[in-house]
């Protein structure tokens, strides 16, 4: 290396040039325009500078708002400060107290020289109710103070002031509202719109999930966000709790749909389909549902399924890893934030991340300065973030939604399983291997349930409405001739949309014709949904009081069935035996025998061995499901997707099954007859 090359190399390795006094020179932006967010921040800071450098008192803030109006009700200058005060005052001052101060100022403004001031106060109150009508409806105390204010205006004000208090002038804009779903095909059309999960296109499923997500996100009000930030919980905020519950329901629905398949290859097909759905959600910029779907796919109960993941293609595995990296919590969701900032069209945020930002901003700065004045920069920062979320609620999702598919998804998401049940099903599908397994290629599970414990369950009325909507959609598309029935083949396919809810609950065909009526399908879905949603109705066993000819033990308490006749109960389908007082506490699912008859077998007929609670077993074996949880074997297994086994011939709609919870499976057994 010669001397010239050495100098050139030393210049290349030289650090960034520094300015005077050893300070690094800041990078300059050449020929670039500021972003809209930067412009809004500068405008807001300029407006705040007109008030005070760091803050102002409550009286000064009220005076500034009053002076924003002229005699005609027009704004004299920009409305940023006014809107910020009206939207954010409730964070530091109750709205009823704020309105009471305005009432006091109105009463103190007496004399002919104060008519303009009174008129300005009336314009301020009217503007407040026009721009923020929800505040009065959600605060009874504020509504009472506002009523006293307008009553005072009616008594002491002039005709112009009284006209502002007219009820017709108090507008109540409700926003654009949720998008209108696309109308379903009419009865006269001779084609079917598929309501089957296997037939749904990934893009179609992603669009409908986006519609449900946007409808839930659009219902959240600024008051809900304020209550969450100040209280630290979604309790007491129905709309926010519903949004959180929807995300958690989608995540668990993904897990249950994967685990509903009996074989590894079939589970891999569902995994691959949901990976494609996640990619479509990313294209739609629906990050909240994307977080839920990806979180469900990366949940440890799913990622541990080595045999199932072995059937995935390398491209699918790579796509899942990329989605996991995108939504990972590393560096405060840095990759998600960069992707979010680059989205310009329709987009839905990860609500938990943005609520976390609001909480951090609220906790980082005080509400008031040491001298008692309000800290306006903090209120303005919170206001700007709330405005960003409010602007997102004015969007319109791309595409149209089918009302029928929305009914199907709504009822599917109503079905609820606990975390323990999902884990137990995962271990039942692929039991633990005693040999050491290679480490999982997936990252740590995403934190999807940012509000743990939020698992809203639909009440009976809501569930019934969802079922009626779905039945209407089913007959609209699968009975175009209006005969009032659907075929058994269509019913078998439809039942596969609901993981585990339909297992063992197939009603008899209508009048033996091999078809199902509207009433039968409604009753079937109500029972299946109630079972899966844990609303108090259980179906696992069909017990019948019998007389045992040989010593028999109770499956629930392991006690002996004493007596001469009718010592206990036996399930007509699986042969499980128990005491009269134990039949409501049986915790073993009903596994129907291939040769089970509808009527009870003779008392002297042999009964398969009934297991008793084992002494010791891992927690992963404590099964509590309404379907067979046996690992994959060569035996015949009924499957809700493939419908490989015909419906049970002895199902009786008038029979009310007795509640029975699930219990740990056992290895030891005792003979009973």
Curated annotation (Swiss-Prot):
Domain of life per record: Eukaryota
Compositionally biased residues, Pro residues: 603-612
Protein's cellular compartments: Cytoplasm; Cell membrane
GO MF annotation, one: zinc ion binding
Cited CDD domains: C1_RASGRP4, RasGEF, REM
SMART domains for the chain: C1, RasGEF
N-terminal Ras-GEF domain sequence ranges: 49-172
Region (Disordered): 1-34, 162-188, 593-618, 638-673
Stretches annotated zinc finger (Phorbol-ester/DAG-type): 540-590
Biased composition, class Basic residues, residue ranges: 1-10, 20-32
BP-aspect Gene Ontology terms: antibacterial innate immune response; cell differentiation; phospholipase C-activating G protein-coupled receptor signaling pathway; positive regulation of natural killer cell mediated immunity; Ras protein signal transduction
Matches recorded under InterPro entries: C1-like_sf (IPR046349), DAG/PE-bd (IPR020454), EF_hand_dom (IPR002048), PE/DAG-bd (IPR002219), Ras-like_GEF (IPR008937), Ras-like_Gua-exchang_fac_N (IPR000651), Ras_GEF_dom_sf (IPR023578), RASGEF_cat_dom (IPR001895)
Domain spans labelled EF-hand: 466-501
Keyword tags: Calcium, Cell membrane, Cytoplasm, Differentiation, Guanine-nucleotide releasing factor, Lipid-binding, Membrane, Metal-binding, Zinc, Zinc-finger
PANTHER family: GUANINE NUCLEOTIDE EXCHANGE FACTOR, RAS GUANYL-RELEASING PROTEIN 4
Family named by the database record: Belongs to the RASGRP family.
Protein name in the entry: RAS guanyl-releasing protein 4
Organism: Bos taurus (Bovine)
